[in-house]
């Protein structure tokens, strides 16, 4: 990417387990700061805090490690940090994000959200009881690194939950009013993979083929719904998970 001074954004587990420290060490000085205050449904306050780290540390690129929450937080922070704004200005009110953004490298550790290939960041504003997506062309990661081995340690309930999320993305992308033939093909392929492999991954976490195919399904489902967008199921989930 030709950038220096990276920021690692990851969930608290990665810092407690030592994995975040290992990633920073392996970067050989390219990653100079980290941010780990990311909750399962990232809050706008967390995005603003992450953006402030980017500003203060003169960050040139961002690495997001984890599930959809760190990736969504990093996407929004990497854009809003180049302004003096709070992300609240753009959250759920239809105000377009600025086009300028820092490069983002997404490294998913779950097979579920597909956030590594989408232009969407789903954020909560717990203080105001609101959860909504922000869509911006600047949210597309510059690179996505998909390593199925990173998903081996997912607990069975997380494997199941994220697997159903993949299926939901595929189905909603297919039945959305904005669907089109290419997205339909991707959606059907992703759904087929989920039906075939999610139970295997649930029952046997180290099943290499099942984990690889679920990562494939997650990425492809992300591509499938990016253009047509998700529908009623996700809309209903926002107040339930806020």
For each predicted feature, which ranges?
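N-terminal, positively charged, Ser/Thr/Ala/Gly-biased leader segments
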Residues: 1-7
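N-terminal small/polar loop signature for handling phosphorylated ligands or for N-terminal nucleophile
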Residues: 15-85, 200-211
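Glycine/threonine-rich beta-strand-loop-alpha-helix active-site module
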Residues: 45-146
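Carboxylate- and glycine-rich phosphate/diphosphate-binding segment that chelates Mg2+/Mn2+
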Residues: 120-228
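Conserved catalytic block of serine-dependent lipid acyl chemistry
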Residues: 230-237
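Catalytic phosphate/nucleotide-handling subdomain of diverse soluble enzymes
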Residues: 238-242
């Amino acid at each position: 990417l030709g950038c220096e001074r990276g920021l690692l954004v990851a969930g608290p587990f990665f810092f407690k387990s030592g994995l975040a420290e290992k990633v920073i060490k392996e970067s050989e000085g390219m990653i100079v700061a980290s941010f780990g205050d990311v909750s399962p449904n990232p809050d706008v306050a967390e995005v603003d805090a992450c953006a402030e780290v980017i500003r203060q540390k003169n960050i040139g690129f961002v690495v997001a490690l984890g599930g959809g929450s760190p990736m969504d937080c990093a996407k929004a922070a990497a854009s809003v940090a180049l302004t003096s704004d709070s992300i609240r200005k753009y959250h759920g009110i239809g105000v377009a994000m600025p086009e300028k953004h820092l490069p983002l490298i997404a490294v998913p550790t779950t097979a579920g959200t597909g956030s590594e290939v989408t232009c969407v960041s789903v954020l909560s504003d717990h203080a105001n009881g609101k959860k909504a997506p922000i869509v911006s062309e600047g949210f597309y990661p510059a690179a996505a690194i998909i390593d199925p081995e990173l998903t081996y340690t997912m607990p069975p309930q997380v494997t199941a939950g994220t697997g159903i999320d993949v299926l939901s993305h595929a189905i909603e992308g297919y039945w959305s009013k904005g669907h089109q033939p290419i997205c339909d093909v991707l959606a059907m392929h992703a759904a087929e993979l989920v039906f075939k492999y999610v139970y295997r991954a649930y029952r046997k976490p180290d099943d290499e083929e099942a984990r690889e195919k679920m990562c494939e399904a997650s990425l492809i489902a992300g591509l499938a719904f990016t253009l047509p967008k998700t529908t009623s199921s996700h809309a209903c989930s926002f107040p339930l998970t806020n």
